[in-house]
Amino acid sequence: MNIRPLHDKLIVERLEVENKSEGGIVLTSQSVKKSNRGKVVAVGLGRPLKNGDRARMEVKTGDQIIFNDGYGVKTEKVDGKEYLILSESDVLAIVE
């Protein structure tokens, strides 16, 4: 991959949602909501602070996250694959 996030940004690969309902019915692609879970594939160096240091990033490459899929999330295709670019503040939780 040839994309590198800056500051407090993350590059995330969206994880697929299961296409079956709780009752076992197979759902069409129009019926399936986009997943708000993803795998972090790249992490920026952290937000620059006034004193010249950088804020420590809590999210690491390889983490599985739950994120807020809202206004600030950008989608970018790299080498034919779709990635999300989001801020660390858009991360709601790390799945352990």
From Swiss-Prot:
Please name the SUPFAM superfamilies in this protein's record.
GroES-like
Which Gene Ontology molecular-function terms are recorded? ATP binding; metal ion binding; protein folding chaperone; protein-folding chaperone binding; unfolded protein binding
Naming one, the record's GO cellular component terms include: cytoplasm
| Any one biological process term the GO annotation gives | chaperone cofactor-dependent protein refolding
UniProt cross-references to Pfam families, sorted A to Z: Cpn10 (PF00166)
Chaperone found in the keyword field: yes
Subunit (UniProt): Heptamer of 7 subunits arranged in a ring. Interacts with the chaperonin GroEL.
Task: State what this protein does.
Answer: Together with the chaperonin GroEL, plays an essential role in assisting protein folding. The GroEL-GroES system forms a nano-cage that allows encapsulation of the non-native substrate proteins and provides a physical environment optimized to promote and accelerate protein folding. GroES binds to the apical surface of the GroEL ring, thereby capping the opening of the GroEL channel.
Q: What is this protein called?
A: Co-chaperonin GroES 2
Native organism:
Vibrio cholerae serotype O1 (strain ATCC 39315 / El Tor Inaba N16961)
